């Protein structure tokens, strides 16, 4: 019976399949025993030999045959697969493996035994006149045995090629690769099945002594019926015996060869004992490498020891009372047995890093471990680029996380980033990392990573400068690796910025939120970002500013509503954007085609609106409409059969003229635009490409002027030729070209040569020198000083260990004409220095001779609301203070003399008013295209502006109610009409498509 997934009914039946195997053994025993009489006793020596052989063959077993990490049932004839969430399915497939497909182990052994026993029994009269006799006896025995056994795998299942599926390998090295639902003959891989041996010895010794007192008595009760005299009867009056014995066994099992992943690459390696050392053949995926020594001072691979010893003794005393047939026996006895079994040598993972360690145990209560040093193998250690910069990494074994994640892994412990310059500032960037809250999902059987990661930026003395703490969702499969939290703190753990990200499961088909408290599983859902919140703290760790964003989704994960609430407690900066989507009418899985979009403020006033028509088969936008108060701007698009945009028709102007641009593409790749035509005016520009690197070889403007470009083999620009020049206009050289040899200490540079028409053979060169991280540290320019050619060198830029520019030397002249030479030591030593806070904001700039400018940051209030505050104080103690809102917009500026200027904005960030220190306010009004429509100035009065749908300003009315009219030919201004004085009117004439002398598209005449 198959049940749906997930199973939603209780009491679903489950069926168990037995693991079966069969063992066949053949045994030959040979033995001999002899009895020899000796003076009233008997001596019996014995001995024997035994030999056995056979095999154990598995008939049915469990292996994950298809890689779903659920065990499937395999037998001689077929494989029965399990379902994705457990339980047997009805899928049964036969396999094509020749011979016995399951595990087969052969074994053989020999054993020897020996023994000897002695017995003695005598009767001795007490006296010549007495009828009593003494009965004396004794016995002794000695036995021993020894044996040796060997076993070896004939066929095994193991994943030899690292694809996660068990393959079948035979003793001869032949492999059948598992393809999940069938097998393929892989030829010879290499032989390395398990092989082992065992030795055992045993022995025993025992002995005893007995004594008895006998007498001949006439028992009255035994008189005969015929009244004749009864004959005497021998009666045991007293008897005693003493016996003792000792025995022992000792068994040692050794594994001589086995497969185990020694180096952690996911491939089982072959480890074996050989000549007193442990050797390994590393698995390379398609066979084994040659033998290497794993441990030269160890010879055991896997050893178990079991011993058992016992001692026993007994005393027996018996006696009779007179002639009565009653016997009393006292029989005290005792014994002691001691047995022990332990593993003396084992390859097993002790520290939880997933790698086998070598563990030995000689004495009870003591264990020695040789940890596997392969944990960092194959982990990236360092990267060095051609410029000498790079980074080095080190790793450590993660802490044990307990039940939530019992596995330990190698994690990044430290990261050093260096720029490759030896003579500059101490600027190596150092980071260390901490991890916590790892989680292992036992249902999915995979680790979801760490829930908490801390990144520490370190000072040059390795102390913590600042820390970024990040939290990730790692409890559910669909939510894994999503960041839910971020916190910035300094070295004293003082908070600066805290961020929260909230994700919820939403149904793919509807966008509805899944109730995680009641849902059996999340079903067809996805993790959707539902909310963002950012908190900003002051110096006392009080929250001063909070910003929030909210997201709402529809079907297929489409965002249907976005709310930027801005700063908490401030409604004026809130904006709500709603979106609708086109249906997938053509069933092309094009579910994310936006149909319309609206933006509104907190009063529900419309700020922006647009919608579009699309091609349902290809998802192409055919028409885009943007709505203003009285106009609608329509832009149309056309495409070719390759999906390239071939025509754009812009919005109509006031005369209903629409600009049209047509695009043509290359005929090989159909990807690069090679021709652009302005249809109304007939202007054409062209571009030719090097299709190998996708870069232009030449561009021709609408006047026929050609710019030519050349590149090196690495695709870097090496020359530019302007239309009026010959040879080159700009030439570019680089510190390394294709095939060059890199020399240690070379500084990366790039040189630009400007052609100088007055000195054709001596171009003006500018060389930029960078460090190994690509940061510019110096610039050298050709210059002439006092009639001599020299270099004007910019001061070196030094960076600190956080990548910030902290020192800038002043420029100087350098007689060294080697333009690529990096001059780290300046002759004048003049430099400006800069210090920063935790958030990389400048706090102090010191110019040469001690001139300082200080900056401070915090929070300030305006109108009862908190804002970001920054201040700058110059050397004369003049301070400029600025208040900025959560969007980064300046809301107030206080200049020296306590002169205050204030600014206000709408939700779109458009300036709506500015109030000067005289408390005079200028206001601004915008249309739904973002164009200013009105400005009210305290002196100039009210200015109004009108536009057509194409965005051209068609009129401007000033504060005196005088209107200036603007006229256009498509999108080109042709006439300006002023009020009252027509003589001031202006008319512009443009060059048409036939105009010469670079006049096409340009103003060739102005009439006013």
What are these regions (language model features)?
Residues 58-65, 153-160, 255-262, 343-350, ...:
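Beta-propeller blade termini
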Residues 50-60, 100-107, 111-113, 145-155, ...:
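Repeat-based blade/solenoid architectures
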Residues 65, 74, 160, 169, ...:
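Fold-core signature of tandem repeat domains
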Residues 67-76, 162-171, 264-273, 352-361:
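Acidic/hydrophobic-patterned starts of short beta strands in beta-sheet-rich repeat architectures
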